[in-house]
Amino acid sequence: NDKGKKTAMTALSLMSMASVGHQPIHPNEFGRAMQNALDFILLDENQDDRGYFGSKDGGRMYGHGIVTLMLSEMLGMGINKETDKKIRDQCQKAINLILKAQKVKKNSAQQGGWRYTPDARDADLSVSVWQLMALRSAKNSGLDVPSSAISNAVSYLERSYKSKLLSNGDPAEKKSGFAYQPGGAAEYTTSAAGLLAMQVCGEYESPFVHGAADWLL
């Protein structure tokens, strides 16, 4: 319980357990713990009518992105068809909210990103990477995610890279990092987050990825 953010923290715990091979269907203490955790996340009270997971526990868009990513990773892992359907339905609703929040009018530098609330008119990298990773995971799992939403989010990350851009869109600074917001200073934490998110999106050979990796090392 991190100051009440039970939904987001439970989602992180579920992903941690899944990453080492545990599943809710496993007939052991780990499987039962995951079943209970997933049942808690799927309570109707945790997701409002908009599809938002971030209001009840105070996690805002951070928590929403984390829970959505977890649900997309848990698709097909429910203990029965009813649970699988609920995971899919709630995940798609959560994805739809992310897509709607991305379309809220922002200035040109902030377009494609997200911030603390679904109606925010600005963006930052730390919130945006969770939404982007959730979108990519959901698309990989067959949910309805326009490719343009992912490419627009990647463009936002590129604008957050601490460098002027050349006419071809590549960074002038070959060795630099990602900032909290476009125009800010490169930071270790945001550079690591931006690097991870871009790789999750398949941008393995991007000069932004190589530049951030070199800067971090």
Tell me what each language-model feature is.
Residues I41:
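Patatin-like phospholipase
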Residues D2-A33, N46-S151, R159-L217:
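An alpha-helical repeat/solenoid feature that recognizes helix-turn-helix modules
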Residues Y156:
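Active-site neighborhood of glycoside hydrolase catalytic domains
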